[in-house]
Each structure stands twice: as C-alpha cells, then as structure tokens.
C-alpha cells in the first residue's frame, strides 16, 4: 500500500531525510529557494514503507518532510471506511 510523502518549502537542503530513508524514496533536486540550492524530492513514493525515518531525521522545527500513511490520508479526506 502506497503512502504520500510531502516535502514542504521549509526544507533547508541538508540531505538528512534522504540519508535516513531505507528504501531510497527521497532524492535531492536543484532549487533556488534555500542556501543549499537543493531540496528533497520524493519521486518513488510507491516504495515508501511508512517508517517515518525521514521525519525523525529532519532538523527543521517545521518538519519539512512528512509521511502520510494510507489510512491517515483517507481519514483526512473523509473517505475512511
């Protein structure tokens, strides 16, 4: 079951989440919106196992990367059974 991975613009480009991900869901891409000139991206969300290690590794106060587990996503959209 696939999970949603959202990267917010509070990302500082530190690569901590990319290094923490055991299934290589995340990667860094060029971005001019921060000092590091890069931001995390989640091109392989189908491989996300929902461990949330990326969230734990994020050093920003705003949790720049968030994993929404399948049941959390459907519940927030009002379509849970």
Swiss-Prot record:
Primary location: plastid
Enzyme class: oxidoreductase
Known cofactor(s): [4Fe-4S] cluster
Keywords, in A-Z order: 4Fe-4S, Chloroplast, Electron transport, Iron, Iron-sulfur, Membrane, Metal-binding, Oxidoreductase, Photosynthesis, Photosystem I, Plastid, Repeat, Thylakoid, Transport
E.C. number(s) listed in UniProt: 1.97.1.12
Reactions listed under catalytic activity: reduced [plastocyanin] + hnu + oxidized [2Fe-2S]-[ferredoxin] = oxidized [plastocyanin] + reduced [2Fe-2S]-[ferredoxin]
Purpose: Apoprotein for the two 4Fe-4S centers FA and FB of photosystem I (PSI); essential for photochemical activity. FB is the terminal electron acceptor of PSI, donating electrons to ferredoxin. The C-terminus interacts with PsaA/B/D and helps assemble the protein into the PSI complex. Required for binding of PsaD and PsaE to PSI. PSI is a plastocyanin-ferredoxin oxidoreductase, converting photonic excitation into a charge separation, which transfers an electron from the donor P700 chlorophyll pair to the spectroscopically characterized acceptors A0, A1, FX, FA and FB in turn.
Protein name: Photosystem I iron-sulfur center
Species this protein is from: Helianthus annuus
Gene name of this polypeptide: psaC
């Amino acid at each position: 079951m696939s999970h949603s991975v959202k990267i917010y613009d509070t990302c500082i480009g530190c690569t901590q989440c990319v290094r923490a991900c055991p299934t290589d869901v995340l990667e860094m891409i060029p971005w001019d919106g921060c000092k590091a000139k890069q931001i995390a991206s989640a091109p392989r969300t189908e491989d996300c196992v929902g461990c949330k290690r990326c969230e734990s590794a994020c050093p920003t106060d705003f949790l720049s990367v968030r994993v929404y587990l399948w049941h959390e996503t459907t519940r927030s959209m009002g379509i849970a059974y």
